[in-house]
Each structure stands twice: as C-alpha cells, then as structure tokens.
Regions:
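Conserved mixed alpha/beta catalytic, RNA-binding, or beta-rich assembly cores of soluble enzyme
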Residues: 1-295
Length: 295
C-alpha cells in the first residue's frame, strides 16, 4: 500500500513460521535503506517504508549490516515496484519466496545470477505489484442497552465484503473514554482496515455506509473514514478521545483538520467514537487500553 501524500508505504507479509519473519525484520531494519519501522505479530510482519530509493548497509549479517534489505519503493501509475537484496538464505527469501506471493504481477532479476539461490550467493530482485491504498473505517454507537454489538456487526461487515480490488486487512477495538456520561456500556469503537485499489475506493465507502446503516440498532451511529497510511498533521484529538468529553462539534472540526471523512448521514454523537476508532485504528495494542495503559 502507498500513501503518496505522506510519502510512505506499508508492506504486509505472512510466513508459515515466526523465525523467517523475525530474522528478516531485524535485518531489514539494520540495513536501513527506505525502511522506517517494522512490527512483527506472530508469523506476520508490517514494514513501514518511505517512497523512493536510499543506500543500504547490506551484506553478511554483522554490526550495522543487514543480510536482507529493501532498497526502494517506487510508484508508477497503478504499479508499485519494491527493490530487494538478500544474501545466502536471505537471498532465497527475496529471490524465490517473495516473487511467489499472491498478487505479484511480475518479478525482474537484474542478472541471470540473481536467479540462482542458496549457498553464499547474493540475490537482487525487483517485485512489481498492483498499487493499493489504505482505508481505515471507524464505526461506533450501533447497539443499544438491549441489542447489538458494534464489534460483531463491524466484523461481519468486513468479512461480507466481496468487492474486487479490496482486501480486508484487520479489525481493531478502540477503547474510548469510559467516563463520558453518554456512551455504550464499554465505550468501545471498532476500526476496520482495508487495502484498496484506487478505482475501488468509492465502491468500498458506499458498501461500508450501506451495510452499517442497514444493520445498526441505533439512530446515533457514526461512520468515519481515513484514506492514507499516516496522518500528515498532529492533533490533540488522539488523546482527547480517550481522556476528555468531546463534543460533536469538536469531533467534526478535528476530523476536517486531519482529512477524516464522515460517511454516516446521522450527524449524531456516534461520530465522536467513530473518529476515535480511526485515530487509533493503526496504533497497536494500546488502542484497546485506557490512555497510557500498556501490557
């Protein structure tokens, strides 16, 4: 996924085992290049990178040298090219494993030697994939005292989506300020993250809006959407949604500042929680806790 406005990309990888994911993550981070951060969760890795090309500290694993590296992430029309280097077993990973990932359009090897993997060989490859963007949806206030559960409805919404060019990534529960006087029982919003081809963004937004409005039990439901990987401006709202009593007017003002769009037609208090869900929808496990709470 790419976010040209913020100049960043996000690459999500899945493996059959933890070992390769953890080793690759440590070495890519050590090698530098365009890598800016990495999160490992079990057998999955989420790699953050800046768009463009940058020098790497690449070679056999050692102090300040990574045995695998991401040299570039470049966008051309509806395609994204990632340039990789790997040595020995790490070369097998970039030259033989990554090119077989679902969705890869084609792979380009600079030389014939790069096709030979194993031993102490060094391998380089350019992997071309379809361009995807990231959309985060925040949903809140869909239940009542007697029926409904926002997280259940949100997850069903995501899993029921069959739009071509749309991939459901994950769902996160966001703990909002439990001290507010008007709230659902646990005061929790739901965030849904998708990878979307640009031409399918409008269809996904309409699908989410329609599904939520058809399945909600509340007239206060809020639906928020952010198109991008990172927020380009900071806001006190990140803290406020977990610590303060926000008004609807404050929530709408902060959303406009941050480039967050409300999709619901209610314009009710559910927008406050929907905003909070989007703000924390990609901030890790701390999203599920009270402000400042860590495991």
């Amino acid at each position: 996924m790419v976010d040209e406005r913020a100049g960043v990309a996000e690459i999500i990888e899945h493996c059959l085992a933890r070992g390769p994911i953890e080793w690759d993550a440590m070495n890519r981070h050590r090698a530098g290049g365009v890598v800016t951060g990495c999160l490992v969760e079990g057998t999955s890795m989420t790699l953050k990178a800046k768009l463009g090309r940058a020098p790497v500290n690449f070679g056999a694993a050692a102090d300040n040298i990574g045995g695998q590296a991401l040299e570039a992430v470049e966008v051309s029309g509806n395609e994204v090219t990632t340039s990789w280097s790997g040595i020995a077993g790490a070369g097998v990973g970039v030259a033989a494993c990554l090119p077989q990932a679902p969705g890869v359009l084609r792979s380009e090897y600079p030389t014939e030697d790069d096709l030979r993997t194993g031993g102490a060989r060094t391998n380089r490859v350019r992997i071309i994939s379809p361009r995807y963007e990231k959309l985060c949806f925040g949903i809140d206030d869909t239940d009542t005292r007697t029926e409904g559960a926002t997280w259940v409805m949100a997850l069903r919404c995501a899993e029921s989506c069959r739009i071509e060019g749309v991939e459901f990534l994950n769902m996160r529960l966001v703990q909002l300020n439990p001290k507010v006087p008007q709230k659902t029982t646990n005061c929790v919003g739901s965030a849904l993250n998708f990878a979307v081809k640009p031409q399918n963004v409008a269809d996904l937004k309409e699908y989410i809006r329609k599904y939520v409005e058809e399945h909600t039990f509340s007239s206060d439901t809020g639906i928020a959407c952010y198109r991008g990987i990172d927020f380009t401006v900071d806001s006190t709202a990140f803290k406020w949604v977990k610590t303060e009593i926000m008004t609807l007017e404050q929530a709408e003002r902060e959303a406009q500042t941050l480039g967050i769009e409300f999709l619901d037609r209610n314009a009710k208090k559910g927008r406050i929680g929907a905003l909070g869900a989007v703000l924390w929808g990609n901030r890790g496990i701390e999203a599920a806790g009270l402000y400042g709470e860590h495991l």
